[in-house]
């Protein structure tokens, strides 16, 4: 399971060794997919490179329309980018609240192929 909460059946050292071995491949895969997004999507909707590690973030006005088209094409993307306001009780963050409603995160890991990345760019470009 993706969020397996059971205890590890290895030492911390063994676990971190696995991460260290796999990390270069993970980084290379993310960079390959991110390059497709950078080249095929308008620069005006891309967040800066500092934001593209976990997923590839874009900011769009018509988020729901874009998401509907993405899912209709058999692809997937995320919106799990809440406003930071929820972390600070009683504090209003109007800019963050508005921006959170326009962010879509595109997958850039081993679950998403280069062909899927190109296809999702075509879908997004046809809608925006």
Give the ranges of each region predicted by the language model.
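PLP-dependent aminotransferase class I/II
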Residues: 1-128
């Amino acid at each position: 399971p993706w969020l397996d909460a059971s205890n590890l059946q290895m030492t911390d050292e063994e676990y971190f060794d696995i991460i260290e071995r796999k990390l270069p491949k993970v980084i290379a895969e993310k960079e390959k997919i991110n390059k497709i997004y950078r080249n095929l999507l308008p620069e005006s909707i891309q967040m800066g490179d500092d934001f593209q590690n976990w997923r590839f973030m874009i900011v769009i006005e018509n988020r729901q329309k874009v998401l509907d088209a993405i899912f209709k094409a058999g692809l997937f993307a995320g919106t799990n980018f809440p406003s930071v306001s929820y972390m600070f009780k009683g504090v209003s963050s109007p800019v963050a609240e508005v921006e959170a409603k326009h962010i879509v995160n595109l997958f850039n890991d081993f679950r998403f192929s280069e062909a899927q990345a190109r296809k999702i760019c075509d879908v997004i470009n046809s809608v925006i």
